[in-house]
């Protein structure tokens, strides 16, 4: 008799447990999906919208902080002073965008390991200064979609 009681209680607990757990799980999944969607949208708009255009020097991006002021702007972003000023800001880094690159100045101020400032994607310094003062490296795209822009950085919008 006691065994029947125990098994009945266990069955009731299992049924009750299932009834309660289902909505919580569903809600969690829904919230997770919403959160993921929102996070993805924010990442894309920060990375592509803000980072990739005229204001790329001020942009944040998909990979904020630490290791990237931009993809191959290298590891300059996290370790430089003012990432908002394009590429790697003032401080340099492994592949710094260097100096005031976001405002059209020469990219060699405060170099880094590649003291030309922009061996990658600023197209300056080590690569002979191609486009080094044009809108494609140090002007509108200074540090550009790839440096402090689309792929990361701690720009003013990336904080």
Curated annotation (Swiss-Prot):
Keywords: Cuticle, Signal. Larval (posterior) and imaginal (anterior) epidermis. Residues 1-21 form the signal peptide. GO terms for molecular function: structural constituent of pupal chitin-based cuticle. Disulfide bonds: none annotated. Transmembrane segments: none annotated. This protein is glycine-rich and contains several repeats of the motif (G/S)1-4(Y/F) like structural proteins from insect egg shells, egg cases and vertebrate cytokeratins. Component of the pupal cuticle. This is Pupal cuticle protein Edg-91. The lineage of its organism: Eukaryota, Metazoa, Ecdysozoa, Arthropoda, Hexapoda.
